[in-house]
């Protein structure tokens, strides 16, 4: 029944279908954050479902044995799950967008911000190269997985590159509020009781868009924040 309804954004489900379901995944992680975003998308909260705290391998094992209704997975296992007939319920970028954040120490920010801007320039140049060349992106993503001990087939890596590109060009980054997802994550952790409100405010106070703005100005990219 859950797969019977898909909206214009490609997201499966409805409030009536999801309410009361058992969802398995690790608490306090992006998977948990994503599930909350998915529920909020349909006007629900985590209290409307039975969320079971389980690590990815245990959740997947239980799911394969027939337990639960929805299971959280992480790359590169998402591709393999699709090959087994499992269905992704929606694009994370639609229900709970999350962008990685680059951070630096307060010392280098205060004393050598020009070096940070140069670093940002290199990062976005690499990302734009990856966005232009799927094979290049897959090659380096595969190297990353190998380095951290993940086993991923070439097909799984390419699927992630082609269907779940989490990279932004500099022009795209100029339109995304700097630190927004970081602050949202802090609020999420606060709601779980993992950090205090004062720590969330500290995160908010440490968001500094000025260096990215400077890079955009130097690169002739319009700043739209």
Regions found by a protein language model. Name each.
Residues 10, 23-30, 51, 55, ...:
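Extracytoplasmic/periplasmic, Sec-exported soluble proteins
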Residues 40, 45-47, 87, 147-153, ...:
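Short coil/loop linkers at secondary-structure junctions
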Residues 58-147:
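Pocket-lining segment of extracytoplasmic ligand-binding domains
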Residues 183-225:
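Conserved C-terminal helix/tail region of periplasmic/extracytoplasmic solute-binding proteins
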């Amino acid at each position: 029944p859950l797969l019977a309804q898909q909206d214009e954004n490609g997201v499966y489900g409805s409030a009536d279908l999801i309410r009361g379901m058992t969802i398995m995944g690790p608490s306090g992680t992006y998977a948990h954050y994503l599930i909350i975003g998915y529920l909020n998308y349909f006007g629900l909260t985590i209290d409307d479902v039975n969320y079971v705290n389980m690590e990815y391998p245990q959740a997947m094992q239980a799911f394969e044995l027939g337990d639960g209704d929805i299971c959280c997975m992480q790359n590169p296992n998402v591709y393999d799950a699709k090959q087994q007939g499992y269905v992704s319920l929606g694009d994370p970028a639609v229900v709970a967008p999350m962008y990685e954040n680059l951070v630096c120490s307060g010392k280098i920010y205060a004393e050598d911000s020009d070096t940070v801007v140069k670093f940002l320039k290199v990062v976005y140049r690499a990302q734009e190269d990856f966005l232009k060349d799927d094979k290049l992106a897959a090659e380096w993503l595969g190297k990353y997985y190998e380095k951290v001990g993940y086993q991923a087939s070439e097909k799984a890596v390419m699927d992630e590159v082609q269907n779940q590109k989490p990279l932004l060009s500099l022009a795209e980054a100029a339109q995304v509020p700097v630190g927004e997802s970081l602050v949202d994550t802090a609020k999420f952790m606060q709601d779980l009781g993992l950090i205090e409100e004062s720590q969330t405010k500290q995160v908010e106070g440490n968001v500094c868009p000025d260096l990215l703005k400077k890079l955009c100005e130097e690169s002739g990219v319009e700043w739209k924040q």
